Each structure stands twice: as C-alpha cells, then as structure tokens.
C-alpha cells in the first residue's frame, strides 16, 4: 500500500513516515519545505531515503493531483504555521486545502481508501497575551 503524507517533512509527518516505513508501507511526502517550519527551505537530512519526496504546495491543485495519484491512504498534516496575522493564508492552507483534497478524490474518482486529517496549533492561532500573576 502507498501512503501520501502532506506536510510529511514536519515533526509529526516525518515520525509518521518512519513508522509507516517500518510497517511496510511505501511513503510519498508532499511538502513545501518552506520556513518557518524548515529554517533553510531545504530537504531535511532526517528523512529516510526510501521516501518519495514531492516538493509542492497543498494550495495548488496541480501539486495535489500529482501527489494524490497512485496512493491508497492520505495523512493530511500540512499546515501553515507562522506568528503573523495572515488569516487568509491560514484558511487557505489549513482549511481550504482539506476540502480541495476531497474534491480531487471525488472528481477524479481516485481509489483512495482512507483520509486522516490532523489539526495543528495554527487553527487556533496564538491567542491573546495577557499579563497574569500566575494565580488565575
């Protein structure tokens, strides 16, 4: 079985890839390898050589179609993470990309058996910073 992990070069994605490889799965990763997650915008050395790497963007349909074709299972871990208030970018990466994955699967009648979607801290944002004396 072949698995696609979006955001697979990140912390959770890379550990998921390692586990899936140990269990005998073939693994493909779609990742943008961009900052701030990847500090120098290059492919991390910790990724196993058996992983099929695709540099791409979950907000671009062409990249998603290529990544989804030929896989049986999808782990959708890709997320935009930054501390700047770029709300439209958060929504496009963290919400719209999930819908786009399902739309492509249905439209192209891809035989994908399962899609696992994980959230990230990015969905809630940073929140408000409040002074506190620690007693609240």
Where are these regions (language model features)?
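N-terminal Rossmann/SDR dinucleotide-binding element
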Residues: 1-73
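Short glycine-/acidic-enriched loop or helix-start segments at secondary-structure transitions
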Residues: 14-16, 39, 85-86, 126-128, ...
């Amino acid at each position: 079985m072949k698995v696609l992990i979006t955001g697979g070069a990140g912390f959770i994605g890379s550990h998921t890839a390692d586990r899936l490889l140990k269990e005998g799965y073939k693994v493909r990763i779609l990742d943008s390898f961009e900052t701030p997650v990847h500090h120098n915008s290059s492919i991390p050395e910790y990724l196993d050589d058996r992983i099929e790497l695709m540099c791409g963007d979950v907000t671009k349909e062409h990249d998603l179609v290529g990544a989804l074709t030929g896989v049986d299972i999808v782990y959708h871990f890709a997320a935009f993470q930054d501390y700047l208030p770029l709300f439209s970018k958060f929504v496009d990466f963290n919400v719209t990309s999930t819908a786009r994955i399902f739309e492509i699967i249905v439209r192209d009648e891809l035989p994908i058996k399962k899609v696992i979607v994980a959230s990230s801290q990015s969905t809630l944002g940073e929140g408000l910073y409040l002074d506190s004396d620690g007693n609240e």
